[in-house]
Amino acid sequence: MIKPLIAVAIAAVTLTGCANNNTLSGDVFSASQAKQVQTVTYGTLLSVRPVTIQGGDDNNVMGAIGGAVLGGFLGNTVGGGTGRSLATAAGAVAGGMAGQGVQGAMNRTDGVQLEVRKDDGTTILVVQKQGPTRFSVGQRVMLASSGSTVTVSPR
């Protein structure tokens, strides 16, 4: 009974780390963005700053659950009687905390904060994943926007 549960927990944690966060960059588009009309404006980069983009804490739940199951299983293999129960509980708590920390580290990606002076004189700030294209101050850029989403690309 416990072995299938552990296998499912490990698979869930592993697959959660495979989530595609490439749509955060200006070089990758989601399927829903394809063939959609976007407004295009142009501008010049005023500043470029490297940042880290952290995924939401709700994404760490699978890591915590997987870690707790694995930690509880390992704790259950220690001792007997009351000692085994305490080891199981301690293993589940420690495993949950470790799993959440590992999942949190996997949810981080390198990004870039771009301050852009648009040709109309307004200044905006955009954070997006750092793609293969490197940005530099003074560079002309294209801004493709749809709703509140803006993607910055080199011109």
From Swiss-Prot:
Residues carrying lipid (N-palmitoyl cysteine): 18
Signal listed as a keyword: yes
Alphabetic keyword roster: Cell outer membrane, Lipoprotein, Membrane, Palmitate, Signal
Pfam families documented for this protein: Rick_17kDa_Anti
Signal sequence range: 1-17
Lipidation (S-diacylglycerol cysteine): 18
Location of the protein in the cell: Cell outer membrane
Source domain of life: Bacteria
Topology term for the membrane: Lipid-anchor
InterPro entries membership: Bact_OM_lipoprot/Surf_antigen, Gly_zipper_2TM_dom
Keyword hit for Membrane: yes
GO cellular component: cell outer membrane
Sequence similarity: Belongs to the Pcp/SlyB lipoprotein family.
Protein role: Facilitates ferrioxamine uptake.
Record protein name field: Outer membrane lipoprotein pcp
Natural source organism: Yersinia enterocolitica
